Design a protein with these regions (language model features):
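Acceptor/aglycone-binding surface of glycosyltransferases and processive sugar-polymer synthases
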Residues: 57, 69-73, 77-87, 92, ...
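Donor nucleotide-sugar binding loop of glycosyltransferases
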Residues: 16-19, 47, 77, 103
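A conserved acidic beta->alpha catalytic loop
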Residues: 44-53, 100-101
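Short beta-strand/loop segment that forms part of the nucleotide-sugar
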Residues: 24, 36-47, 69-70
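N-proximal low-complexity "stem/linker" segments adjacent to membrane-targeting elements
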Residues: 1-29, 36
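Hydrophobic helical membrane-anchoring modules
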Residues: 2-3, 184-320
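Acidic helix N-cap motif at the loop->helix transition within catalytic regions
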Residues: 18-22, 49-58
Length: 320
């Protein structure tokens, strides 16, 4: 597509064949009305319901306005977003789910917040949700935890509708279930201006939700991971080495105290107790062993961090 693009819209999808024509038409209608030069990047995460065939038909209608990537198998939403971000060239990059629950009508206002108000990232907030209670309650608890841990005052971290300055998506790496924590990744990458806009949420029109307890558990594990990696990911030795050294010193000091105490009692003819009969002795030895192991863990982490290949390698067999 010739010329500079105002907007890239990245749409990760899995088995959403019914909603794709309506979504593409909606995005086109909004962007055409606002005279935005735009592209839509649909990333098919290994769908088995004919979604790719629908995308091929849409490509014939919309031409260069539509790009598409097809994964050979299902890798997850983070993988789809990562590949979409790599392909995006628009000045502002949007993400939205393919299930029609995110409204493209929000695009102009969210873009203005980035372009005119200077935000690096604007996240949607679905204040009034049309999801089942079993999805809303865990989501509320998750958002509270993420807010507390990160210090970012967002009400809806997991909203699929987000707007980014292009430099943000080109500076972060998402994998696992990290798509939930892109605002946290952006903050730790140095992008401090993170805003929120209340958006209209719609009930799912086609298909069924892919939400499940397994995803919730993985999300919490990734929250721990992203917090740790943001602080120590570049140098694991800072964490493991420091903790290991502290444990080793504590164990060594305790051992010296036990030995010194025994010598003192021998010199002064005081009652002695066998070192092996003292629980403190075993705690000291345990601390020394743990200290050495933690130090070695930090060293191995450094080696892996310095020599690891790119973790985001996904097999794609089709591109449009």
């Amino acid at each position: 597509m010739a010329g500079k693009l105002d907007i890239s819209v990245v749409v990760p999808l899995y088995n959403e064949s019914e909603s794709l024509p309506e979504l593409m038409a909606w995005i086109d209608r909004v962007c055409t009305a606002e005279k935005f030069a735009y592209e839509v990047i649909m990333v098919d995460d290994g769908s088995n319901d004919g979604s790719w065939g629908v995308i091929e038909q849409l490509k014939g209608v919309y031409g260069e306005k539509l790009k598409a990537i097809h994964f050979m198998r299902n890798y997850g939403k983070s993988a789809a977003l990562y590949c979409g971000f790599e392909a995006a060239v628009g000045e502002v990059v949007f993400t939205m789910d393919a299930d029609l629950q995110d409204s493209p009508d929000e695009i102009p206002a969210m873009r203005r917040m980035v372009i005119e108000e200077g935000y690096d990232l604007v996240s949607g907030w679905k204040r009034k949700r049309y999801d089942p209670l079993g999805k809303r309650l865990p989501s509320k608890f998750f958002n509270w935890t993420a807010r507390t841990v990160s210090g970012i005052k967002l009400n809806d971290f997991n909203c699929g509708l987000k707007c980014y300055r292009k430099s943000v998506v080109k500076s972060i790496e998402v994998y696992g279930e990290m798509h939930r924590y892109i605002p946290i990744l952006a903050k730790y990458a140095g992008f401090k201006r993170i805003g929120e806009k209340e958006v209209h949420h719609q009930a799912r029109k086609y298909g069924v939700s892919k939400f499940g307890m397994e995803r919730m558990i993985k999300g919490y594990l990734d929250l721990i991971s992203v917090t740790f990696m943001s602080h120590f990911g570049r140098s694991p030795m800072y964490f493991f080495g420091s903790l290991g050294t502290l444990m080793f010193i504590l164990g060594g000091f305790t051992t010296c105290w036990i030995i010194g105490s025994k010598i003192y009692k021998q010199v002064n003819d005081l009652p002695l107790r066998a070192v092996a009969d003292q629980p403190l002795f075993y705690l000291a030895i345990l601390a020394i062993i743990l200290g050495v192991q933690l130090f070695l863990a930090g060293f191995l982490g450094e080696l892996i961090n310095r020599n690891s290949s790119d973790r985001n390698r996904y097999l794609t067999d089709k591109r449009l």
